[in-house]
C-alpha cells in the first residue's frame, strides 16, 4: 500500500505476491563511463577499445563479492580488445590513460592478454598459455569463496603450458 494513497484496485482476478528472486540472469557489458567503444548486440559485443595510447575499461552489469562465476570471451578483433579479466570495482572503469592495463597494481586486476596469452596482474605479466587467434574462446572461472581465478582457451584450462588445473590465487 502506498503511503500517499496511490493504490491500484484489482479489477478482476487475484494478485500474486512474488519475491524478487531472479534466476538464469545473464551479465552484459556496462556502457557507463566507457570511452572509445561502441556497444552492439544488447551490450554483449564491443567494437573499438583504444585510441592508440589509452586503455578503456568496461565493467559488467553484475558485481560480485562472493560466489562462483564463469564466463567466456570470443577473440573477434585482437588489435582492439587486448586484456580480459577482473578488477576491483572501487578502482573505477573510466578511461585512464597509459595506466598499464590489468597488470597495473592500481586496479587489483587479474586477467590474460589476447595477443600473447600472458597472465596479467599484481603489477606484472608473465607467459601463461600462448597467444590467441581470431575466434578463439577465452574462459574465465572466478571463485570468490576460495579466492581463485582460472583462465583457459577453447575448452582447456591453462597451467602455463596449455594443460589443466592452473589457478591464479588471491583474486580479490
Annotated model-derived regions:
Residues 1-172:
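PRY/SPRY (B30.2) beta-sandwich protein-interaction domains
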Amino acid at each position: 500500500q502506498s503511503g500517499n494513497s496511490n493504490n491500484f484496485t484489482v479489477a478482476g482476478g487475484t494478485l500474486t505476491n512474488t519475491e524478487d528472486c531472479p534466476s538464469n540472469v545473464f551479465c552484459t557489458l556496462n556502457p557507463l563511463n566507457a570511452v572509445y567503444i561502441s556497444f552492439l548486440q544488447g551490450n554483449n559485443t564491443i567494437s573499438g577499445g583504444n585510441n592508440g595510447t589509452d586503455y578503456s575499461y568496461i565493467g559488467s552489469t553484475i558485481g560480485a563479492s562472493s560466489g562462483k562465476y564463469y564466463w567466456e570471451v570470443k577473440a573477434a578483433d585482437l588489435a582492439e580488445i587486448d586484456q580480459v579479466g577482473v578488477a576491483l570495482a572501487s578502482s573505477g572503469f573510466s578511461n585512464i590513460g597509459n595506466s598499464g592495463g590489468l597488470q597495473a597494481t592500481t586496479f587489483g586486476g587479474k586477467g590474460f592478454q589476447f595477443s600473447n596469452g600472458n597472465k596479467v596482474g599484481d603489477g606484472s605479466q608473465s607467459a601463461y598459455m600462448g597467444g590467441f587467434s581470431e575466434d578463439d574462446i577465452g574462459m574465465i572461472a572466478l571463485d570468490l569463496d576460495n579466492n581463485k581465478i582460472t583462465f583457459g582457451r577453447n575448452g582447456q584450462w591453462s597451467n602455463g603450458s596449455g594443460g589443466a588445473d592452473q589457478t591464479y590465487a588471491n583474486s580479490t
